Amino acid sequence: MTPPRDHGGGLDAAIARHGGRRDDWLDLSTGINPVPYPVGQLPADAWQALPDRAATEAVIDAARAFWSVPDGAVIVPAPGASAIIARMPCLPAAGGRAYVPGPTYNEHEAALAASGRWSMTPDQDTADLLVRVHPNNPDGRLADPGIFADRALTVIDESFCDTCPGHSLVAHAARPGVIILKSFGKFWGLAGLRLGFAIGHPDTLLPADGRRNLAELLGPWPVSGPALAIGARALRDTGWAERTRSRLRHDAARLDALMVAAGADKVGGTDLFRLYGVPSATRWQEMLARHHVWSRIFPYSDTWLRLGLPSPVGWDQLERALG
């Protein structure tokens, strides 16, 4: 049985229940940078033409430089990290036992179960496949750098690691059987663009011996021309990234101060989302929703409430909701 896929978002359902227009709402249910990268103008052929190899190579080169990807690893762009997660269970490893320590982002276990090739095990030491979200969603836990072992696949999902690049495990990406996942949409605030990357050893991602490889599973032209152009531009803009990390760090501390003053306890998180302990997560979500602030709660916890960061114009609305 495939596990349920519970996610943030769902603002339409919140509006249907609590009223208001979409523009009235402050959606803090996701962990997406509320100040997106300024995309600027794009050349007409980015929209009109099928993406060519040069555009793909440009974003790969920019990604290699930005994340300091080792020379022995290859980079495969995809239409979002979720597209890679959905196909990952079909990569060359023959299947077997998979370990996904939770609570964590639920798409990994759901994709493994849906493939029919992997069964879940509670024992990391006997697992043929290990998935770690690093830092973890929703509590921000970091994986142990000694996590790598002799197993068929070790997948490190670094979708939220761009706020803390010093903790990245991408230096291990050239090891056979290791896959590092990167999400573009979260840190750069452009989730609708749909761009992600798989980084790993060529024999793991792109085997040339007739086994399934990720590029074939994704199909031709998997990433749009606009996504390739914007991705390459943004990944080369290291100054914007540094300024953004500083702002996110400041805003995360500001959010913590507001929530603690309102009676919540800090549990964890990253600089893109914060996790709090409250007496009743459902009641807190309802309280915030009455002020048109949408939050994230979890089916496995009655007390965890997760908030993303408000946009610069959203802080007053959150403060009123907490007042």
Where would I find each of the regions flagged by the language model?
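N-terminal "arm"/small-domain region of PLP-dependent enzymes with the aminotransferase-like
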Residues: 1-55, 62
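Short beta-strand
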Residues: 27, 181, 265-269, 296-299
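Short, conserved charged micro-motifs
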Residues: 39, 126, 280-287, 313-318
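Conserved beta-loop-alpha segment that forms the PLP phosphate-binding cup at the N-terminus of a helix
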Residues: 57, 72-96, 106-108, 196
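Active-site phosphate-binding strand-loop segment of PLP-dependent enzymes
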Residues: 113, 120-166
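PLP-dependent aminotransferase class I/II
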Residues: 179-260, 264-266
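Conserved PLP-binding catalytic core of the aspartate aminotransferase-like
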Residues: 249, 259-291, 309
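PLP-dependent enzyme catalytic core of the Aspartate aminotransferase-like
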Residues: 290, 300-323
